[in-house]
Amino acid sequence: MAVEQVTYKNIDRGTSNMIMAGLAIAMLASCFDSTIVGTIGFEIAKDLGGMGLYAWMATAYLLCETVMIPVAGKLSDIYGRKILFLIGLAIFTGGSIIAGLSVSMEMFIVCRAIQGFGGGILIPVAMAAVADLFAPSDRGKVQGLFGAVFGIGSGIGPLIGGYIEGAAS
């Protein structure tokens, strides 16, 4: 089976930087969201009366995100990066809004799963977009930037969650 050669779009630097900034912000939000419940989850479970389901807050998100990553990568090859990214962003944002309005632990967990599906679309599509937008000589730098965004998002989630928990109690 031959390897398909990906050709990048030759667009101006300002446009590609703007696109990458948007992708990086969405990826930051997804990574942040996957770790924030580590510190604030106890308070959420207590407020929603669902301590028995506490572990499912993170599990639902991460399980759905993990399942969606390879699926989203393939779907973005078939249907295009932009449309799939927008769908992922809509799913992630909708899940986040409804999670904030949850009145029960079960509802919150379902919303976390929805967020995970959206996040599982955002991450691989953002990474694949690098090949579409940058020459092979620049891809390593941009992938490194995305790796940093992933690390920062995953790292600040628990910090901000801890701050919110401290301020709420």
What is the meaning of each model-derived region?
Residues 2-169:
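Transmembrane-helix bundle of Major Facilitator Superfamily
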